[in-house]
């Protein structure tokens, strides 16, 4: 065995161990302190959102009109510090949530948590809006601008510049976990979804023995087809052409694509609701009945009524976070680049 093969095997083993550790860590964090109590992450996310909402006077309602005016460009000033307009900063953040997170995330919540999980997704979204308001405002307030005029912000800068240098270790920890998270929820899931969908269609079109769809083994650990590799190369090339231009190029591209994605998503949802208008009220009944109903059919929720309710709540909050990123902190990194001298304006956006 030469050095190249040894390196590939070592990389494959390390990747597998990191994946296994990441899955176990993810499940442990979300189920802590125990599977028969309300998980700490649910209390932290929803509880903090409720406290901030009440303490700040329901900003998601109070500043809604102002946020729309800011996003429309009413207060744009090209001389303000920053890299992107308010609209571009918003679309950059939205590009990470519109699509897989809103569609696959909701479907997963329904499958594992039952109809009642949608209620907890609504709760997470409503109170999570205040968390986004706070984290985006703070990220603009405590961002840094280098000598070339480019901005750098996010929760890591908020922690270090707002809480003091003694908390720099926490800022570094957040940045590290954010990088790890970006590989999974920010890239791997979307790439896999695109590749898997194209592969499924190609499999029906060409069959399993075609050179594009035939599975090949890699070190007896992974199996993939030539088309899946090709999909990855094309996606990497397209993304590379965008990100090589920096945050301004990203903002320009998302400024065009994100609104199209959002319009298609909303129109599709409305058309589905119109087509199934006779089932809308019964769907609402299922959702509210499944919130605290211990007889709801929930996958993997053995252990009685309490476990069923906790699983429904947990899946709703988990997928709610994945769908809107409220409280995660990643959206604030994009919003911190907005051109404004008034941090609260970007918070309202």
Question: Residues of each region from the PLM?
Answer:
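Membrane-embedded translocation segments of transport machinery
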Residues: 244-248, 252-255, 260-331, 335-336, ...
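Membrane-interfacial loop-to-helix junctions in multi-pass transporters
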Residues: 36-41, 75-83, 115-116, 164-171, ...
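Hydrophobic alpha-helical segments of integral membrane proteins
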Residues: 25-36, 60, 64-72, 155-158, ...
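Helix-loop-helix module between adjacent transmembrane segments
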Residues: 52-53, 94-95, 124-149, 156, ...
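Transmembrane helix-loop boundary segments of multi-pass membrane transporters
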Residues: 27-37, 108-125, 189-196, 210-224, ...
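Membrane-interface loop-to-helix entry segments
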Residues: 44-68, 192-198, 227-289
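N-terminal alpha-helical transmembrane segments of multi-pass membrane transport
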Residues: 1-100, 110-117, 128
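Alpha-helical membrane segments and immediately flanking helix-loop junctions
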Residues: 79-111, 138-162, 169, 173-176, ...
